[in-house]
Amino acid sequence: MGQKIHAFMFPWFAFGHMTPYLHLGNKLAEKGHRVTFLLPKKAQKQLEHQNLFPHGIVFHPLVIPHVDGLPAGAETASDIPISLVKFLSIAMDLTRDQIEAAIGALRPDLILFDLAHWVPEMAKALKVKSMLYNVMSATSIAHDLVPGGELGVAPPGYPSSKALYREHDAHALLTFSGFYKRFYHRFTTGLMNCDFISIRTCEEIEGKFCDYIESQYKKKVLLTGPMLPEPDKSKPLEDQWSHWLSGFGQGSVVFCALGSQTILEKNQFQELCLGIELTGLPFLVAVKPPKGANTIHEALPEGFEERVKGRGIVWGEWVQQPSWQPLILAHPSVGCFVSHCGFGSMWESLMSDCQIVFIPVLNDQVLTTRVMTEELEVSVEVQREETGWFSKENLSGAIMSLMDQDSEIGNQVRRNHSKLKETLASPGLLTGYTDKFVDTLENLVNEQGYIS
């Protein structure tokens, strides 16, 4: 056993990144290592309750500089629409002096980062090791190693003919296009210059994509597993929702959640509501109000609330509380999960007993959906038109292809999902990834002689 290390963590300013970083920080602290977590001041309040080792993990709040185009007070991705993410990335770059000062004062042995591509250069100058820890899918990294390829055509050496973009995915690529070139530069620069690469995944899901990344960058790729938090048994699902769900039959309720960054156009939001209504099943939808609307209520289709009264609810107040999602998925009445296939939601769906329907919105979500739907065959994807629009009929059809007891597709998907979940839930598998990662990291840092 080597010396204990002091690790800095500096993730992208989005809760979908900061949260798994903190879960990994908890694992490091559990093993006796020290963690300094660099994050925006406002984010600290929302993450403090997930710090299980406050004596081992110290939050280091950052002042987010003013940037023209970034709304006053915005410090995380959930504070802004996707179109403004580029300004948040500029603000992150402007914290460089604060990061450098913290490293100089606290002398860590290692800094983990993802989108701050300048970290390796700075860390090297200060004799600190750097690790790019990617919390999104390995598939999206592997695919984008060769940019600018033809849609539907695998890049050279890419290990899949299924996890690809297609013509009707242009909406997802265009949605993020303003940030995409910057993102690609950031990520590839970080991958090339860092000392170590680690990814929040496991071989059972993305092994061949991790091998491809390793072969391209000639660096060992360490896997942490999904970094799912331990269930907080002290905070069960609120009684009003538990009782409401319990009023329906086992496995009959459709739960839909599209993440804190997804804001649909009003007409697409209404089509989502109508599509779920069309199934005839009880449902619970947790989404943000659509563009141009202040509340969910004002944007609902005409007559919708009256038609679904007693069997359906569309709610807009949970999207900032992702810890509720696994509690809902675990309720025995919930039988189907409609999701955007964010990487955290993907793992939560896999570890549930629900049938899984994906409506990917952003580029990495599209590729992860293809792995789940076409490689592993544990879910279905809602088909979109060339414009990116999905119809109520396609949404309803996707849900019912899984929820109809006589559906051959539904039964096959359920068997595949059950088998994969059994593998992932086998004793020690996922915790083994984390334990191995921590031990390997400790050895790597000690071997390099940078322990302070």
From Swiss-Prot:
GO terms for molecular function: UDP-glucosyltransferase activity. The gene is UGT79B11. The keyword Membrane does not apply. CDD domains: GT1_Gtf-like (cd03784). InterPro entries: UDP-glycosyltransf_plant, UDP_glucos_trans. UDP-alpha-D-glucose binds at residues 260, 319-325, 340-348, 362-365. It comes from the Eukaryota. The keyword Membrane does not apply. Belongs to the UDP-glycosyltransferase family. This is UDP-glycosyltransferase 79B11. Keywords: Glycosyltransferase, Transferase. Its EC number is 2.4.1.-.
